[in-house]
A protein has these predicted regions:
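Active-site gating/metal-coordination segments in enzymes
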Residues: 1-44, 97-101
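Active-site metal-binding loops of divalent metal-dependent hydrolases
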Residues: 3, 41, 71, 135-136
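Acidic (Asp/Glu)-rich catalytic clusters
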Residues: 23-33, 55-62, 83-93, 120-126
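Conserved, mostly hydrophobic/aromatic
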Residues: 30, 70, 96, 135, ...
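Structural preference for beta-strand elements that scaffold enzyme active sites
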Residues: 34-38, 65-67, 93-97, 129-131
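Histidine/acidic-residue-rich catalytic or RNA/ligand-binding cores of hydrolases
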Residues: 48-54, 76-86, 106-116, 140-152
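Aromatic-anchored helix/helix-loop segment that forms the rim or "lid"
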Residues: 86-123
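Mid-to-C-terminal alpha-helical segments outside catalytic/metal-binding sites
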Residues: 119-120, 124-131, 140-177
Length: 177
């Protein structure tokens, strides 16, 4: 569910409390249908960026899997914010995709800052909680499709086992593939 200010729910509506009544109706419906709740909370500093509220939500629905998009969307030089967010959302039912990290950090290929964000996320959460994602075609304005995976595939910061979990095993687990 895209709730961001840019192109999501809050781009066209007033601020919606992610832990409010209206959203709980959506979460409950998703849980009742056995869905994985994928949520993009937008960028830091926007009214849609409600990590505190989301932490309460994931605790209220422990049987439902959540995937938080963009690793909570850290921008350039926001490692401390990333660490805080990951610790706050570190629950058994919460996973993270890493789509658009290179775009968010605005660094040139091989996107070393994005690599360091993924490395830190694995250190905090473990290798089983992070899913690769590209955010294509939207990310085409920043990098090629090959670069969107090669920056991690070719990185020396990750073991082969970690890469297999990131690119393959975790998605199978989360989405029951």
């Amino acid at each position: 569910m895209e709730v961001s200010n840019g192109s999501g729910l809050m781009a066209n509506h007033d601020t919606v409390d992610l832990n409010g009544r209206v959203m709980h109706e959506v979460y409950q419906m998703a849980q009742d249908h056995g869905l994985v709740f994928v949520i993009d909370i937008g960028r830091p500093g926007n009214n849609c960026y409600q990590v505190d509220a989301l932490a309460k939500v994931v605790q209220a629905y422990p049987q439902m899997k959540f995937v938080v998009c963009h690793l909570t969307a850290p921008q350039h030089n926001q490692m401390e914010l990333l660490e805080k967010n990951l610790q706050q959302l570190n629950y058994p039912n919460v996973y993270f995709d890493i789509a658009s990290l290179p775009n968010n950090t605005k660094q040139p290929y091989p996107f070393t800052e994005a690599q360091s964000y993924v490395r830190r996320a694995m250190d905090i959460l473990g290798k089983d909680k992070i899913l690769w994602g590209s955010d294509f075609p939207a990310a085409m304005n920043y990098c090629s499709y090959r670069e969107a995976y090669a920056y991690l595939e070719d990185s020396k910061l990750f073991t082969q086992e970690e890469k297999e979990h990131l690119f393959y095993h975790n998605a199978r687990l989360v989405f029951s593939l």
